[in-house]
From Swiss-Prot:
<feature type="topological domain" description="Cytoplasmic">
    <location>
        <begin position="126"/>
        <end position="142"/>
    </location>
</feature>
<feature type="transmembrane region" description="Helical">
    <location>
        <begin position="105"/>
        <end position="125"/>
    </location>
</feature>
<keyword id="KW-0244">Early protein</keyword>
<keyword id="KW-0339">Growth factor</keyword>
<keyword id="KW-0325">Glycoprotein</keyword>
<keyword id="KW-0812">Transmembrane</keyword>
<keyword id="KW-0472">Membrane</keyword>
<keyword id="KW-0964">Secreted</keyword>
<feature type="signal peptide">
    <location>
        <begin position="1"/>
        <end position="19"/>
    </location>
</feature>
<feature type="glycosylation site" description="N-linked (GlcNAc...) asparagine; by host">
    <location>
        <position position="34"/>
    </location>
</feature>
<dbReference type="GO" id="GO:0007173">
    <property type="term" value="P:epidermal growth factor receptor signaling pathway"/>
</dbReference>
<dbReference type="GO" id="GO:0016020">
    <property type="term" value="C:membrane"/>
</dbReference>
<keyword id="KW-0732">Signal</keyword>
<keyword id="KW-1043">Host membrane</keyword>
<keyword id="KW-0245">EGF-like domain</keyword>
<keyword id="KW-0945">Host-virus interaction</keyword>
<keyword id="KW-1133">Transmembrane helix</keyword>
Length: 142
């Protein structure tokens, strides 16, 4: 991993934690003492950020100077300029190799049960009739 990617990841984690915390800043003035004013942790850039992010929203963080991009789904990069390849995205479609494996297992178990039942019926028939298996094979093919 490159250092730029690590820095971007760290900045995104800081921005996300600031957005989730919603801290208030204490201010004092001659008229009002210890009042709290809510300043949003993240706000949109406004007109100065138009066109900065190619596929996403331009944002300002309260504790970090500069503009940052919140990328739309399917895009990544500092300015959301890179398309995420389909191979790396998690898609809702199941993988074709894993979707038929349970069906194949059930079919194999059923075939095994059918073969076992056939062998048991042949065995019971030979015990009941006291015919050797060679004679029974001749009877089946006549």
């Amino acid at each position: 991993m490159s250092i730029k990617y690590l820095m971007l990841l760290f900045a995104a984690m800081i921005i996300r934690s600031l957005a989730d915390s919603g801290n208030a800043i204490e201010t004092t003035s001659p008229e009002i003492t210890n009042a709290t004013t809510d300043i949003p942790a993240i706000r949109l850039c406004g007109p100065e950020g138009d066109g900065y992010c190619l596929h996403g929203d331009c944002i300002h963080a309260r504790d970090i100077d500069g503009m940052y991009c919140r990328c739309s789904h399917g895009y990544t990069g500092i300015r959301c300029q890179h398309v995420v390849l389909v191979d790396y995205q998690r898609s809702g479609k199941p993988d074709t190799t894993t979707s038929y494996i349970p069906s194949l297992g059930i079919v194999l178990v059923l075939v095994g049960i059918i073969i076992t039942c056939c062998l048991l019926s042949v065995y019971m028939f030979t015990r009941r009739t006291k015919l050797p298996i060679q004679d029974m094979v001749v009877l089946y093919f006549l």
